[in-house]
């Protein structure tokens, strides 16, 4: 399941006040004028959220995620591309068309390089 179920610890880091703006319809995330392809899904919750950098022991998340929402269904986060099901070819899809990038159960998947950029940001606006 793509929605995270276990978050272990929050991490305190230097923060960047500029929000990440995610457009679900175009499957992109932008910081000011710099935009990046993302994997999203029809269940990606829209709204404005604070981001909390958290460590996780869940497999396939590479140790940390940026949590933006938690509810009874689980935890929604921005994280590196989840490769728990290799048949989904998520790394390839990240480079594909918008329709290729609509695959997640609500989380926002990004490349390793994009995650490194996003990691210091503490606000996301999802449209």
Which residues does each PLM region occupy?
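Gly/Pro-biased beta-strand-loop elements
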Residues: 15-88
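Classical Sec-dependent N-terminal signal peptides that target proteins to the secretory pathway
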Residues: 1-6
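Hydrophobic helical h-region of N-terminal Sec-dependent signal peptides
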Residues: 8-9, 13
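Exported/periplasmic cell-wall-interacting domains
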Residues: 55-127
């Amino acid at each position: 399941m793509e929605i995270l179920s276990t978050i272990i610890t929050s991490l305190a880091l230097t923060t960047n006040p500029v929000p990440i703006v995610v457009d679900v319809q175009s499957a992109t995330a932008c910081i000011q004028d710099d935009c990046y392809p993302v994997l999203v899904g029809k269940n990606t919750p829209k709204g404005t959220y604070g981001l909390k950098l958290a460590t996780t022991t869940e497999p396939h998340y590479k140790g940390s995620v940026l949590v933006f929402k938690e509810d009874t269904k689980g935890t929604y986060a921005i994280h590196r591309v989840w490769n728990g099901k290799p048949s989904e070819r998520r790394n390839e899809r990240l480079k594909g068309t918008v329709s290729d990038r609509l695959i997640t159960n609500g989380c926002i998947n990004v490349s390793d390089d994009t995650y490194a950029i996003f990691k210091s940001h503490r606000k996301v606006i999802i449209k």
